[in-house]
């Protein structure tokens, strides 16, 4: 039995979240009656309303009246009035991942997991399958620029989804093809230990059926170790690693783009196949690596070399992933979601490759607990920035932690040898500081998962206003 067509309304609590909105949009496009609520209006809510979905602002008990099922994200607390009412009325309550799993049962599925790079890799797989005439359904954790949304309903037999590991529910997802980009210590508030994180990723891959396969990056030592532990499943490895089945070679930066080739090597026959002259309109080895994962899947699904080349060359990127927001006097402003030390280091390395000028990082640390647990890593991930401007911690609902704040972070960066670190007193001061530091040819990279994206989009005009 699959999700009955007559079920509904399906009510989403927190429908404006990036993961929830994508599922709601696809369900609506499939013909289900969808409604929801969110704490505030946002761009996702506006887009859903344009599709005819009723969205209430504010969480109230009466919002769930008439609902057949209530979908909640992990951000929704047990005392939420809509959740409490649903349970009191014995309305079935399902987690976001459980509803996503129901959608995945309707198609063959590629699920992309990893601590970093999921959203970009998901978008790349979608672009390649699209180019190959497969017309996939897509549910992503970020806005795909080519679609203007994070979700689309395709007519083909495949679905491409981002598998969010943050609360462990990605283990519910029935993937036929699994990608693992990397595994780093993250979401320890849920998993408690890094060993538990690794066990979850191992289980994710082992959930793939015998007729499916997993694509895993052995440039990452933890992933390579996982490959050695997984038996009875077909694994395709990728990376610059000389032992990879799908190898990224001859990578070179070119005016904000990346040029490379990919070599496939069959372990049984030893035969090789090469796709040369690949151009990705994004800088950074991490993005080329993500593209290699997507290419590995596309090649395995029978998509031609020429279609692969064309799709990668035309890849439009993802919102908040090295997104150019504007320019002022030859200074380029970039907005990026990077908020983990590994992500920040990769973004700044890409920025360094993209300019002969200075790289000025503006960072808004996201969550006190993340800054606390990864403090040493945060203090050493800004080496490719000529200057670092540090804003207050974005709490994301957390209470402050003594000794974990902007000023201690500034001191930590200086103590670890960084030559130019400044505290940002308040957001209104950013334009003045950037004007003083930046010259033509420089890149200003705004980093964080909080509201720093608003600063990044406002900054070009604020700089122009200063003259």
Curated annotation (Swiss-Prot):
Gene Ontology annotations of biological process type: cell division; cell wall organization; peptidoglycan biosynthetic process; regulation of cell shape
Gene: murC
Top-level taxonomic group: Bacteria
Binding residues annotated for ATP, in chain numbering: 114-120
InterPro entries hit by this protein: Mur-like_cat_sf (IPR036565), Mur_ligase_C (IPR004101), Mur_ligase_C_dom_sf (IPR036615), Mur_ligase_cen (IPR013221), Mur_ligase_N (IPR000713), MurCDEF_pg_biosynth (IPR050061), UDP-N-AcMur_Ala_ligase_MurC (IPR005758)
Reaction(s) catalysed (UniProt annotation): UDP-N-acetyl-alpha-D-muramate + L-alanine + ATP = UDP-N-acetyl-alpha-D-muramoyl-L-alanine + ADP + phosphate + H(+)
Cystine connections: none
Keywords: ATP-binding, Cell cycle, Cell division, Cell shape, Cell wall biogenesis/degradation, Cytoplasm, Ligase, Nucleotide-binding, Peptidoglycan synthesis
Organism listed in the record: Bradyrhizobium sp. (strain BTAi1 / ATCC BAA-1182)
Enzyme class of the recorded protein, top EC level: ligase
Name of the molecule in the record: UDP-N-acetylmuramate--L-alanine ligase
Main location, first listed in the record: cytoplasm
Function: Cell wall formation.
Keyword Cell wall biogenesis/degradation: yes
GO cellular component: cytoplasm
TM helices/strands, residue ranges: none
Pfam families noted in UniProt: Mur_ligase, Mur_ligase_C, Mur_ligase_M
Pathway(s) the chain acts in: Cell wall biogenesis; peptidoglycan biosynthesis
């Amino acid at each position: 039995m699959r999700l009955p067509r007559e079920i509904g309304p399906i009510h989403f609590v927190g429908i404006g979240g990036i993961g929830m909105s994508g599922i709601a949009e696809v369900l609506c496009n499939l013909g289900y009656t969808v409604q929801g609520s969110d704490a505030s209006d946002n761009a996702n809510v506006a887009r859903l309303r344009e599709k005819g979905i009723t969205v209430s602002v504010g969480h109230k008990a009466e919002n769930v009246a008439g609902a057949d099922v209530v979908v909640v994200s992990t951000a929704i607390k047990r005392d939420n009035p809509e959740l409490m009412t649903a349970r009191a009325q014995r309305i079935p309550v399902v987690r976001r991942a459980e509803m996503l799993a129901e959608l995945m049962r309707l198609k063959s599925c590629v699920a992309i997991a990893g601590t970093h790079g999921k959203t970009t890799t998901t978008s790349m797989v979608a672009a390649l399958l699209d180019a190959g005439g497969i017309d996939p359904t897509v549910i992503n954790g970020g806005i795909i620029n080519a679609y203007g949304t994070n979700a689309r309903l395709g007519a083909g037999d495949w679905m491409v989804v981002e598998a969010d590991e943050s609360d462990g529910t990605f283990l519910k997802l029935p993937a036929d093809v699994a990608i693992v980009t990397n595994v780093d210590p993250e979401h320890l508030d849920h998993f408690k230990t890094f060993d538990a994180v690794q066990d979850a990723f191992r289980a994710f891959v082992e959930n793939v059926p015998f007729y499916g396969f997993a694509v895993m990056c052995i440039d990452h030592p933890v992933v390579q170790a996982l490959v050695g532990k997984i038996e009875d499943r077909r694994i395709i490895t990728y990376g610059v690693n000389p032992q990879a089945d799908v190898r990224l070679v001859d990578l070179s930066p070119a005016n904000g783009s990346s040029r490379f080739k990919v070599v496939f090597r069959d372990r049984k026959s030893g035969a090789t196949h090469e796709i040369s002259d690949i151009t990705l309109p994004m800088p950074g080895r991490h993005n080329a690596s993500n593209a290699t994962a997507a290419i590995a899947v596309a090649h395995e699904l029978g998509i031609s070399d020429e279609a692969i080349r064309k799709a990668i060359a035309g890849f439009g990127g993802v919102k908040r992933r090295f997104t150019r927001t504007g320019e002022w006097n030859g200074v380029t402003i970039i907005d990026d979601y990077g908020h983990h030390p590994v992500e920040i280091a990769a973004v700044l390395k890409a920025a360094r490759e993209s300019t002969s000028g200075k790289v000025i990082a503006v960072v808004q640390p996201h969550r006190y607990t993340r800054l606390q647990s990864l403090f040493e890593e945060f203090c050493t991930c800004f080496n490719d920035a000529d200057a670092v401007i540090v804003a207050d911690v974005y709490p994301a609902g957390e209470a402050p932690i003594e000794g974990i704040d902007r000023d201690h972070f500034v001191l930590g960066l200086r103590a670890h040898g960084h030559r130019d670190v400044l505290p940002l007193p308040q957001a209104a001061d950013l334009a003045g500081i950037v004007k003083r530091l930046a010259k033509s040819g420089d890149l200003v990279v705004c980093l964080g998962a909080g509201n720093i994206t608003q600063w990044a989009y406002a900054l070009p005009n604020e700089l122009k206003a200063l003259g």
